[in-house]
From Swiss-Prot:
Gene3D superfamilies: UbiA prenyltransferase (1.10.357.140). This is Protoheme IX farnesyltransferase, mitochondrial. It is found in: Mitochondrion membrane. It is an enzyme of class 2 (transferase). The lineage of its organism: Eukaryota, Fungi, Dikarya, Ascomycota, Pezizomycotina. It comes from Emericella nidulans (strain FGSC A4 / ATCC 38163 / CBS 112.46 / NRRL 194 / M139). Keywords: Heme biosynthesis, Membrane, Mitochondrion, Transferase, Transit peptide, Transmembrane, Transmembrane helix. HAMAP family: CyoE_CtaB.
Length: 506
């Protein structure tokens, strides 16, 4: 009975299309599967085929009646294509990743290096100047905002150029030797007619900055049509209409009047005359000459060389006595050599700086109609930059020879000028290609501050007291630099011979 019952139940099982064992085998997930099976499952998934669906489909389509008693190939045939060696080899030989991801690191570096070499001739993009950046900032503010108007007017001044003028002026003022001023005795000779306090320095800095603002504003007033044709200047305030032409003219006149007035009352008339000449030279000579002849670069270099003369004359005026404070005494006196040397350094510096800058945008200068060496004669443009870079050496040595700076300046100036000359030589050799124009431009940006700060640090007599305090060396006084007088009562005269040992030294 039990056997019959079992056989009966077996027959019933045979009539069933599925058994428990086959049902477990047909499940889509496998608890234990080898690595090859997992790879094949991944490949079939990428190809858009689901392993579970293929197993169920092939199994149920091939399972009929009591065929479960014999080995069914349907379950294994569904896995066999993905487990075949040929399919696995194809999966490893043709990965689904992109060529960039499968590229070896050294080949990628080589490819990027070759691409950079092909684009080496392309000129770097020059960023907008400070005026354009301020104009962009001003345009984002509400039209009735006070900050919008202030930013637009400040953009007229070319802030970076104005600060460069201020730096060269104050550096010359600080480099001027003050031993003659400190040695003045009010009981012997009257003090200078001009102020010797720090108020003079404040008048000088404020007046110089306002004068530079006026000159730069006038330059923009005359060139909005041409500024619109260049990428560096097309966002300036007058081009974009952030400031009216009438307001710009009023601003230029006001800054010139206030600046020159401060220089006249706070320094001396010679400084005021130099500043007025610089405004006229930059706005009314250099600006229109840019569209006429390449000599405009030399005129612009003269404009750059005047501010150091202003600082030197302002300092010299503090030690000038009444009757010896004329413009001839200031500009051509015995102590004026330092001012001319500093002015010469700024004059020479303009050429490597501007020639390198103009080379990178020479096509824009040409399109706007500006007569510049960078496109009219590129070879001469490079030669001029190298020539004036070499001129920096004798001008710097001249400051030491004149007794204005110490021996340390010879070292610092040689390093700075050597770097500039090296970049200028590469600029001349490659005619501005291979990144030499950009290298010379940045060398000029750093060379000038290094030179001026080096002159300030190594100023003659600045470290004498420190040197003597550290090494215990007394400061040697030169008796010839001082004048000794006898106290003479009123009405009494001295009738001693100049050669007499007891006569005062004059």
């Amino acid at each position: 009975m039990i056997l019959r019952s079992s056989l009966g139940r077996l027959g019933v099982a045979r009539e069933s299309p599925l058994c428990l064992q086959c049902l477990n085998r047909s499940r889509p997930s496998f608890p234990a599967v080898n690595k090859l099976a997992s790879i094949s499952r991944l490949q079939s998934t990428v190809a858009g085929q689901s392993p579970s669906s293929s197993v169920n489909k092939t199994y149920f389509s091939s399972h009929k009646g009591d065929s479960h008693l014999t080995p069914q190939p349907s379950l294994f045939t569904s896995l066999s294509p993905s487990n075949s060696p040929s399919q696995l080899n194809r999966g490893h030989s043709t990965p689904s990743t992109s060529p960039e991801l499968s590229e070896l690191p050294h080949r990628r570096r080589k490819r990027l290096k070759e691409a950079a070499a092909q684009n080496n001739g392309a000129e770097p993009v020059i960023p907008p100047d400070a005026s354009a950046q301020l104009s962009n900032f001003s345009s984002t503010l509400p039209k009735t905002s006070l900050r919008r108007k202030l930013a637009a007017f400040f953009a007229l001044t070319k802030p970076r150029l104005s600060f460069l003028v201020l730096l060269s002026t104050t550096s010359a003022y600080g480099i001027y030797p003050v031993s003659s001023i400190l040695a003045l005795d009010p009981t012997i000779a009257p003090l200078p007619t001009l102020s010797t306090s720090t108020l003079t320095f404040l008048y000088l800095t404020t007046g110089t900055f306002l004068s530079a603002c006026s000159a730069n504003t006038l330059n923009m007033i005359f060139e909005p049509k041409y500024d619109a044709q260049m990428s560096r200047t097309r966002n300036r305030p007058l081009v974009r209409g952030l400031v009216t032409r009438r307001a710009a003219v009023f601003f230029a006149i006001a800054t010139a009047a206030v600046g020159l007035g401060l220089l006249y009352f706070g320094t001396n008339p010679t400084v005021t005359g130099l500043s007025a000449a610089n405004i006229a030279l930059y706005a009314f000579v250099y600006t229109p000459l840019k569209r006429m002849h390449v000599i405009n670069t030399w005129i612009g270099a003269i404009v750059g060389g005047i501010p150091p003369m202003m600082g030197w004359v302002a300092a010299a005026g503090q030690g000038a006595t009444t009757g010896h404070d004329t413009w001839r005494d200031m500009l051509f006196g015995e102590n004026s050599l330092g001012g001319w040397l500093l002015g010469g350094i700024l004059f020479a510096w303009q050429f490597p700086h501007f020639n390198a800058l103009s080379h990178t945008i020479r096509e824009e200068y040409k399109g706007a109609g500006y007569k510049m060496l960078c496109w009219t004669n590129p070879a001469r443009n490079a030669r001029v930059a190298l020539r004036y870079s070499v001129l920096m050496f004798p001008l710097s040595i001249g400051l030491w020879w004149a007794g204005i700076v110490g021996h340390g300046f010879l070292v610092s100036s040689t390093v700075a000028n050597g770097w500039l000359t090296k970049e200028a030589y590469g600029f001349w050799k490659h005619q501005g290609a291979n990144g030499t124009a950009r290298g010379l431009f940045w060398a000029s940006i750093w060379q000038l501050p290094i030179l001026l700060v080096g002159a300030l640090v190594t100023k003659k007599g600045l470290w004498d007291g420190v040197w003597g305090g550290i090494f215990g060396q007394p400061i040697e006084d030169d008796d010839d630099d001082y004048v000794y007088y006898e106290e003479v009562s009123p009405g009494k005269t001295i009738n001693q011979s100049p050669t007499s040992p007891s006569s005062p030294v004059v």
